[in-house]
Swiss-Prot record:
The lineage of its organism: Bacteria, Pseudomonadati, Campylobacterota, Epsilonproteobacteria, Campylobacterales. Signal peptide: none annotated. Its main location: cytoplasm. HAMAP family: UreF. The gene is ureF. This is Urease accessory protein UreF. Gene3D superfamilies: Urease accessory protein UreF.
Length: 254
């Protein structure tokens, strides 16, 4: 009896969805490969066109080498990324399991209203819409009735919120979804640093390797947070994102 309780508690803590059989339409889909596919840099949502304020730090000589790039990444991941991206992913994932579309739309509204920089708001909407449309264009993939209802009713989707709905709709584990999303988005940031600072490719890989321990800490922290922490963002990053709007020359849209 005690053993059964322990298993139940563990499943809840890591966000393992209810054991539901695959539909015939998705019987051929391997979620292990699918989660790699949607997090791949070539998945066509346009994330490579955005730096989310990083370009301002680089032009203002705040990020100039491997050490300052790593410092920036740690600060960004533990503030803006954790309380907006990671937490909203978790909240929309859990709401999808509960079939609570109203709560998902509420989370997206909070993010939209809490994101002061215009470029970041537009970037969130573009990436979210593009993620949804790309999934819908994959005709072999049956996302289910709830995802389709979400896709029709969402007004301000973000990449993270739509990804959370996607992961839960296909019965992916929450912790696995968080892990893949965190790594993929951090890798994009590192690529931006390598191209724009610039850094060597080796320095970029050293940065990613050194972030493995912080990655695990961020995932565990995300699982502990609730909706009251949503968008507890970094004011400094918002300022840099606003300043990006008036940079003389720009490589990125945000």
């Amino acid at each position: 009896m005690d053993k059964g309780k322990s298993v139940k508690s563990t499943e809840k803590s890591v966000g393992i969805p209810p054991k539901t059989p695959k539909t015939d339409n998705n019987a051929h889909v391997d979620n292990e490969f699918l989660i790699l596919q949607v997090n791949d840099a070539v998945f066509p949502i346009g994330s490579y066109t955005h730096s989310f304020g990083l370009e301002t730090y680089i032009q203002q000589k705040k990020v100039t080498n491997k050490e300052s790039a790593l410092e920036y990444l740690k600060a960004n991941l533990s503030s803006q990324f954790l309380y907006t991206e990671m937490l909203s992913l978790k909240l929309t994932y859990e709401s999808t399991l509960q079939q609570n579309l109203k709560k998902i739309l509420g989370v997206e509204e909070v993010i939209m209203l809490s994101t002061s920089p215009m470029e970041l708001r537009l970037a969130n909407q573009k990436l979210g819409n593009r993620f949804i449309k790309t999934l819908q264009a994959m005709n072999e993939l049956d996302m289910g009735a709830f995802f389709n209802a979400y896709a029709q009713q969402t007004k301000d989707p973000t990449h993270a919120t739509s990804y959370g709905v996607f992961a839960a709709s296909l019965n992916m584990e929450l912790k696995k979804a968080l892990r893949h999303y965190l790594y993929a988005q951090t890798s994009n940031m590192v690529i931006n640093c390598v191209k724009s600072v610039p850094l060597s490719q080796n320095d970029g890989q050293k940065i990613l390797l050194s972030l493995q321990s912080p990655f695990n800490q961020l995932i565990e922290k995300t699982l502990e947070l609730d909706e009251s922490h949503l968008c507890a963002a970094s004011v400094q990053n918002d300022i840099k994102a606003m300043q990006h709007e008036s940079l003389y020359s720009r490589l990125y849209m945000s």
